[in-house]
């Protein structure tokens, strides 16, 4: 890069420092996989504003690539588990969740999912032990004098490192199973009467039966997640900190929660002052397409194009399913751009082109795009909302069924089950979403809502990180409920006291009435006898 451009970039970063009043040092404890894609957008913006960002990278991480992030600093440390072990487990989790897990109720799939997540938790406990027991690494972090730690709470340990370094920390989170982390650690208020539990597949206005299912799911996830986290993790945290503690107690010291969702996707519920919703922070205006792709899109004429992508984490599907999908795509008049990394289907039509990679945001922002076939990942959904494109949802795993259920409830999508859908089902869904203006109208309303914010989601995320650095925390925003034991938080001691008082008063009243009754009965008998 020419020297004058380096100087200009340096001056730009310095100007951001003066504007914010402080150029800080940010330590990051990330999670791998698609979670890294979301957090990296925030980190890049922090660097652009002149902050120094250091990412702790376990050697077992395979998705997080330092070579693709030249502006960030990385501290890579060795782990006792290998990259292949973590990758193989993740692939196994995807395959089982996508093709084997029952989807009737949370109770039907939870025993299988429970075993997968237990193993996943073990991997991250091992990585955490490798990090905090690395004396050379911890000494270097201590000497670096970081201002704040930014972490993903699904990969526990960032809070422990922040505690050891005596620095404030904040979380970036999409969801946790059953909203357990949000409720037990963040004290989020999520009444099961009208807030669907994540992974329940419910959305919008719930019937009585739905609310019964929702309550059962909530109770199950609360019980399951308690068992998942409260043995080895608690013991380990207590050993490292040198005092009896729990992982929940340490995590509850978080200053700010940045939730990667927003009210265009979510349904309303009560929130807290130390929680901000930053869904769609990666969305941006479309850029021009590559020349050959633009020519293909323009060749669609008035019919337009359909964009088909099942995300970055799924590379292929069964040959039978791919052929069924390709056949349905060949029946529509639109041109189709399909992100697919498998064997070319025999039924692929002349209107469909297959790509190993697509500029998804740029395609969704193209004026000729009519519909988006998606697995329901939050990133893709927000790009579709941002550009106002109706969807055909084929959810695979994680929160995707819930995300698509929300879009269906808001009238912006049609949902299909990848295991049971036929080629005719897929064709019918395509024709419904493309030809019925109902879906376009509803998604455009969501798009308008998303764009009508006083501050962009990315700017809000950066603001809160800088806020924590400026003020050394945000204790004034944390609910006092964090300092209460569970029985006080739920007012069980007050309820018990009031019930006791009521019981005592009731008992005294009954005794007084009995005494008066006996007194007057005896008096009446005495008068009769006289």
Curated annotation (Swiss-Prot):
Record-level Gene Ontology MF annotations: glucuronosyltransferase activity
Modification comment: Autoacylation in vitro.
Uppermost EC category: transferase
Cellular component annotations (GO), alphabetically ordered: endoplasmic reticulum membrane
Function: UDPGT is of major importance in the conjugation and subsequent elimination of potentially toxic xenobiotics and endogenous compounds. 2B2 acts on various endogenous steroids, especially etiocholanolone and androsterone.
Secretion signal span: 1-23
Keywords: Endoplasmic reticulum, Glycoprotein, Glycosyltransferase, Membrane, Microsome, Signal, Transferase, Transmembrane, Transmembrane helix
Keyword field contains Chaperone: no
Highest taxon of source: Eukaryota
Subcellular location: Microsome membrane; Endoplasmic reticulum membrane
Alphabetized InterPro entries for the sequence: UDP-glycosyltransferase (IPR050271), UDP_glucos_trans (IPR002213), UDP_glycos_trans_CS (IPR035595)
Pfam families in the cross-refs: UDPGT (PF00201)
Entry keyword annotation includes Protein biosynthesis: no
Glycosites: 316
Location, primary (coarse class): membrane
Its EC number(s): 2.4.1.17
Protein name in the entry: UDP-glucuronosyltransferase 2B2
Transmembrane spans: 494-510
Induction and repression of expression: Constitutively expressed.
Membrane topology of the entry: Single-pass membrane protein
Catalytic activity: glucuronate acceptor + UDP-alpha-D-glucuronate = acceptor beta-D-glucuronoside + UDP + H(+)
């Amino acid at each position: 890069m020419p020297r004058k451009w380096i100087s200009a970039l340096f001056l730009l970063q310095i100007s951001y420092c003066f504007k914010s009043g402080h150029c800080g040092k940010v330590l990051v404890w990330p999670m791998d996989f698609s979670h890294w894609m979301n957090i990296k957008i925030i980190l890049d913006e922090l660097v652009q504003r002149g902050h120094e960002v250091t990412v702790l990278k376990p050697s077992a991480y395979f998705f997080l690539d330092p070579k693709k992030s030249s502006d960030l600093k990385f501290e890579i440390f060795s782990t006792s588990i290998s990259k292949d072990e973590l990758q193989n487990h993740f692939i196994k989790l995807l395959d089982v969740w996508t093709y084997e897990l029952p989807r009737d109720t949370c109770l039907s799939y939870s025993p299988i999912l429970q075993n997968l997540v237990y193993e996943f938790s073990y991997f991250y406990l091992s990585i955490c032990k490798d990090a905090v027991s690395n004396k050379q690494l911890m000494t270097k972090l201590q000497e670096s004098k970081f201002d704040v730690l930014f972490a993903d709470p699904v990969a526990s340990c960032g809070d422990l490192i922040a505690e050891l370094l005596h620095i404030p920390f904040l979380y970036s989170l999409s969801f946790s199973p059953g909203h357990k982390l949000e409720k037990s650690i963040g004290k989020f208020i999520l009444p099961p009467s009208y807030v669907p539990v994540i992974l329940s597949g419910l959305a919008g206005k719930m019937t009585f039966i739905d609310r019964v299912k929702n309550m059962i799911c909530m109770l199950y996830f609360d019980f399951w997640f308690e068992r998942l986290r409260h043995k080895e993790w608690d013991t380990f945290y207590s050993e490292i900190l040198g005092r009896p503690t729990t992982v929940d107690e340490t995590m509850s010291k978080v200053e700010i929660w940045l939730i990667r969702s927003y009210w265009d996707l979510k349904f309303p519920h009560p929130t807290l002052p130390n929680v901000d919703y930053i869904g769609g922070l990666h969305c941006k205006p479309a850029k021009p397409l590559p020349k050959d792709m633009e020519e293909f899109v323009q060749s669609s004429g008035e019919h337009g194009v359909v964009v088909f992508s099942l995300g970055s984490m799924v590379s292929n599907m069964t040959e039978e399913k791919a052929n069924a999908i390709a056949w349905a795509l060949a029946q529509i008049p639109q041109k189709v751009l399909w992100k697919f990394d498998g064997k070319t289907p025999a039924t692929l039509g002349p209107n469909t082109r297959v790509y190993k990679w697509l500029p998804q945001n740029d395609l969704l922002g193209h004026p000729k795009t009519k519909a988006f076939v998606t697995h329901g990942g939050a990133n893709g959904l927000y790009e579709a909302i941002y550009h106002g494109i109706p969807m055909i949802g084929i959810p695979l795993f994680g929160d995707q069924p819930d995300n698509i259920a929300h879009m269906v409830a808001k009238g912006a999508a049609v949902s299909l089950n990848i295991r049971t859908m036929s080629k005719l089902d897929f064709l019918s869904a395509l024709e419904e979403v493309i030809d019925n203006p109902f879906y376009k109208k509803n998604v455009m309303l969501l798009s308008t809502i998303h764009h009508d914010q006083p501050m962009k989601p990315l700017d809000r995320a950066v603001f809160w990180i800088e806020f924590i650095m400026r003020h050394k925390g945000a204790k004034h925003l944390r609910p006092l409920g964090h300092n209460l034991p569970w029985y006080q938080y739920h007012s069980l001691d007050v309820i018990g006291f009031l019930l006791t008082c009521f019981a005592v008063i009731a008992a005294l009243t009954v005794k007084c009435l009995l005494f008066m009754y006996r007194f007057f009965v005896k008096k009446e008998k005495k008068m009769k006898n006289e």
